From Swiss-Prot:
This is DNA repair protein RecO. NCBIfam families: reco. It comes from Streptococcus sanguinis (strain SK36). Disulfide bonds: none annotated. HAMAP family: RecO (MF_00201). It comes from the Bacteria. Pfam families: RecO_C, RecO_N. The keyword Nucleotide-binding does not apply. Involved in DNA repair and RecF pathway recombination. The gene is recO. GO terms for biological process: DNA recombination; double-strand break repair.
Amino acid sequence: MLKSLTSQGLVLYNRNFREDDKLVKIFTEQAGKRMFFVKHAGKSKLAPVIQPLTAANLLMKINDDGLSYIEDYQDVVTYHRINEDLFIMAYASYVAALADASLQDNQPDPALFAFLQKTLELMNNGLDYEVLTNIFEIQILSRFGVSLNFHDCAFCHRTGLPFDFSFKYSGVLCPDHYHQDERRCHLNPNLPFLLDQFQAVRFSELETISLKPDIKKQLRDFIDLLYDEYVGIHLKSKKFIDSLGDWGSILKDKNEE
């Protein structure tokens, strides 16, 4: 049975279906993730609103047992800076894919919807897309059932010390308790400090981000380890991000010719 619903929606991806139809995966604020069928997509009035990472207020027919349909739309938001930059687009696509992977279909999650939308908005506003992605990755871990402690020592619970991370205890150790895990990570102490900040930061309060390239590289490598150990998903969009270093070198060489 189809039911009418008006809700904010964000297109996660689309794919071809038959000759000129499309299946469009949309994360809606009120009805969760749904798959929509769009007939004759290239000629449809819906064409502007079914592109990936496009947001709009959608009038929909929701089907709990199959494909849903878009009847109309208004207030379309396109993220121009994201769409014009290969690198930002890659990271934006990755956070959208992470949100998709963390949530079952048809399950409303307005908080996650708002978090994803705000992440894309800040990327589009020019904030550091790599660090925004790191923050998103850390805060969304709980939706994969992962709880990590970067705030206080797993043994004495003291704070504000040069911590190191222990996979054995899923948390940090202070210098007095480094010996509790001979296989601790030997991290730069700045990383646990930053990850503790990332867990707590609210994007509504975030105006600027500035980290040195070497710290960003260390964060990227360590968060990859966390995801390999605790989450175990391998997204195509993440593999593309991992290849961006090569793309960057190619583009830089072309610009210098």
